[in-house]
């Protein structure tokens, strides 16, 4: 079978899955993307796209559209979390050296806008919403996918881009689920003048 005839299934229609589908299509390969959500909703928060990402998004032909819904910071400022004291700064747009050095811009974008831009570039081609993966079966030369909606798909290659609770990973690792690392991270936004007053709210905040 030539590479053009390979049936590729991507489990997960997030940032990784959609970007992969676009990259494969640019190389003449079609991937079917199966996403459990019935619609691509506005979930998540800000995503930082440094030059290694924006360079590839430009190559995929989607950077200009994404730039319209992105911000390009003047500089990245690092502050002490307790008193707001400035520790360091990394110029981005301020002196123009970032693009000069890396050949692409640094953007901040909402995850939903990034996902929407990627799915829009696919034009709906090969994107199947409402497909929650139920089981994977090794059929020798092919892999059988079954979804909770009763649909099935036979693929020559399956890519797992289905997140932290990946069904594909459980299949590959013989049922092993996620393993807690012992570390959690929480994020939020507060007004800058509230920083010193809110820095001690978290339990074990000095650990």
What is each PLM-predicted segment?
Residues 38-58:
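Conserved N-terminal glycine-rich FAD pyrophosphate-binding loop of Rossmann-like flavoproteins
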Residues 2-8, 52-196:
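Conserved N-terminal helical subregion
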Residues 8-10, 31:
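Conserved hydrophobic helix-helix packing surfaces used for dimerization/oligomerization
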Residues 17-18:
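N-terminal Rossmann-fold NAD(P) dinucleotide-binding loop
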Residues 203-207:
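Active-site substrate-recognition segment that forms the wall
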Residues 25-45:
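Glycine-rich FAD pyrophosphate-binding loop
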């Amino acid at each position: 079978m030539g590479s053009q005839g390979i049936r590729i299934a991507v489990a997960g229609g997030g940032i990784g899955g959609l970007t992969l589908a676009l990259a494969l299509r640019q190389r003449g390969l079609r991937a079917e993307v199966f996403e459990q959500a019935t619609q691509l909703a506005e979930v998540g928060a800000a995503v930082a796209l440094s030059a290694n990402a924006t360079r590839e998004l430009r190559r995929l032909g989607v950077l200009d559209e994404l730039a319209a819904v992105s911000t390009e910071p003047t500089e990245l400022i690092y502050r002490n979390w307790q008193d707001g004291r400035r520790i360091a700064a990394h110029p981005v747009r301020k002196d123009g050296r970032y693009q000069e050095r890396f050949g692409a811009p640094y953007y901040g974008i909402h995850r939903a806008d990034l996902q929407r831009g990627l799915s829009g570039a696919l034009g709906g081609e090969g994107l199947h919403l409402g497909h929650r993966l139920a089981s994977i079966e090794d059929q020798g030369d092919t892999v059988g996918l079954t979804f909770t909606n009763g649909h099935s798909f036979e693929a020559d290659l399956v890519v797992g881009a289905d997140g932290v609770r990946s069904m594909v990973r459980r299949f590959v690792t013989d049922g092993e689920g996620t393993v807690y690392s012992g570390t959690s991270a929480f994020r939020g936004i507060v007004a800058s003048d509230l920083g010193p007053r809110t820095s001690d709210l978290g339990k074990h905040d000095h650990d």
